[in-house]
Amino acid sequence: MTLENKAEASPATKEETTTEAAPAEGEAKTESSEEKGSKEDQGDNASLYVGELDPSVTEAMLFEIFNPIGPVTSVRVCRDAITRRSLGYAYVNFHNQADGIRALEELNYSPIKERPCRIMWSQRDPALRKTGAGNIYIKNLDPAIDNKALHDTFSAFGQILSCKIATDEFGNSRGFGFVHYESAESAESAIQHVNGMLLNDKKVFVGPHVPKSDRMQSFEEQKNSFTNVFIKNLGTEITEAEFEELVNKFGETSSVHLSTNDEGKPTGFGFVDYKEHDVAVKAIDGLSETEFKGNKLFAGRAKKKYERADELRKQYEASRLEKLNKYQGVNLYIKNLDDTIDDDKLRAEFAPHGTITSAKVMVDEAGKSKGFGFVCYSSPEEATKAVTEMNHRLVAGKPLYVVLAQRKDVRRSQLQQQIQAKNQMRLQQQAAAGGLPGQYMGNPGVFYPGQPGFMPPGRGGMPFGANPQMMMRPPMPPQNQFPPRGVPGGPNMYGAPPQGYQQGGFPPQGPMRGGQPPRSGQPGPQGQFRGAPRRKDGESRVADSISNALENAPEEQHKQLVGEALYPKVLAEKAIDGNAEFAGKITGMLLEMPIKEILEVIDDEEGLQAQINDAITAYNEYLNSQKEE
């Protein structure tokens, strides 16, 4: 093979391999001119893509890393629209391209939160991003080779647009990667010089990247002319000589492989590659279902791993759908069962209404009833009759709840629809009563910090300003000058509580509703707060302390004091996922409620959680409406 010839010509050491892979002097000059042309082709583009980021990396961290290179116009960490979790990549925009070039040279593959980042020019044209020209595929890579090592190896052949090692869910290398060159000539040069060479003592394959659609089309053609045969149930006593004798009688072979374990013992299966397709078909027909040393053999076309997994997945889905269709309308769900009810008693209670095929009470690991179970009838008519007769009937002193059983995904979908309808109705009522902002202005996802005294434009804005997932600076400020913190009407630049506040503090709210101050709680004749309503089960400690503080504070500080107590509770909610920016926005929305209502729920965990969920739903609906527009 050509790979072996190239491998023999290549030295074994890593240093020598790298030297062997480097282009000639004339090629180096060509590469230099390509780099120059690349920079010219970038035009005025000063936007960088930053990938391989830890989910906890924020705009603030990236700003502090990139701003020393040159004035940064904006930083945006891309997040999921619903969960607000980082997608692992971001965009950094500089004022001029020279700063972007320097950042690419100095910061590419530098560690951010102990993970090397991957930086390349942001390519807004999807046609250029998806083009296959200049894209090469490298496999059989040593696990120790990372993105930087791959980039260093292949950068000698031309300007690289992107370079990536494929990894699993744990971040470990999968042994292959991709390098996208600016020109097809650079890609061809890399293939000629590196294909079949040793990298970290492993011979690598380098070839043009073939899109998956083209690979699948080619694969379908290969399936109709296969020559590789898989044979199993050979037993563990078979020898290589016996296996070769078994398969060679059908025709000439290219290779024969009997699988063995670490100890060299056969594992019971093997592969045979025949030279002709017709011979492979003949071997399958001749070996399938035949006896060999007491075992019935199986022979068939050798399949790729992903192909076998896909077939198993399809078989599982078909079996699952068959079961679901079989039990549709005949399986009942029963809950509120007494602990004394077991399978036999459950069957006896429901037996008068039809023929029962199965009855099961669900139990925990200790064998104790979970209080619910299932009964399956032979026909939908019997199941419907049982629901009519047994629903709300007293059994062992407890009324039963009996309905047709539903799949978990159907049940979840119906529940989400019910919650959404309920939240929409509640939000409409609150908007009509002024409980929550009825109108959102400005562009969500962009936050403009400005000079001291800056106010976000628009009325009806959210108390924390628009979604501060994108940080922007005023046009061309002095280099290394950060925007001020604690901007009225919004969070500080990074979406966290402003400096000067205690841990868990909350920033003061700026003017809203067209410049009018936010509504307060229950002011007295001189604007003093009358205090929170008393609860029947005793005053809550948090609400009581807030009430005392409000009585001694000016009216304009009421929202601030309540926010300082409310913000840490919102931040601790599971749905917020520790996102300080998101917690700030939701807290600001809750502060649009009357203070009296806030104090009523601030110590009620379920009540506060319901209000938070309503606010999250309202915010997500707003984002979706903006996308539709």
Swiss-Prot record:
Query: Mind telling me which residue stretches traverse the membrane in this protein?
Result: none
Q: Name one GO cellular component term.
A: cytosol
**Major place of residence:** cytoplasm
List, alphabetically, the InterPro entries matched.
Nucleotide-bd_a/b_plait_sf, PABP-dom, PABP_1234, PABP_HYD_C, PABP_RRM1, RBD_domain_sf, RRM2_I_PABPs, RRM_dom
**Entry keyword Cytoplasm:** yes
Query: Which residues lie in Basic and acidic residues bias regions?
Result: 26-42
Q: Where is the composition biased (Low complexity)?
A: 493-506, 514-531
Region of interest (Disordered), residue spans? 1-47, 465-543
SMART domains cross-referenced by the UniProt entry: PolyA (SM00517), RRM (SM00360)
What keywords tag this UniProt record?
Answer: Cytoplasm, mRNA processing, mRNA transport, Nucleus, Repeat, RNA-binding, Translation regulation, Transport
Molecular functions per Gene Ontology: mRNA 3'-UTR binding; poly(A) binding; poly(U) RNA binding
UniProt subcellular location: Cytoplasm; Nucleus
Q: Name one GO biological process term.
A: mRNA processing
Positions of the PABC domain? 542-624
One Pfam annotation, family name? RRM_1
SUPFAM superfamilies documented for this protein: PABC (PABP) domain, RNA-binding domain, RBD
Residues covered by the RRM domain: 46-124, 134-211, 227-304, 330-407
The Swiss-Prot or TrEMBL record describes its family as follows: Belongs to the polyadenylate-binding protein type-1 family.
- Role noted for this protein: Binds the poly(A) tail of mRNA. Appears to be an important mediator of the multiple roles of the poly(A) tail in mRNA biogenesis, stability and translation. In the nucleus, involved in both mRNA cleavage and polyadenylation. Is also required for efficient mRNA export to the cytoplasm. Acts in concert with a poly(A)-specific nuclease (PAN) to affect poly(A) tail shortening, which may occur concomitantly with either nucleocytoplasmic mRNA transport or translational initiation.
Q: What is this protein called?
A: Polyadenylate-binding protein, cytoplasmic and nuclear
What gene is this protein translated from? PAB1
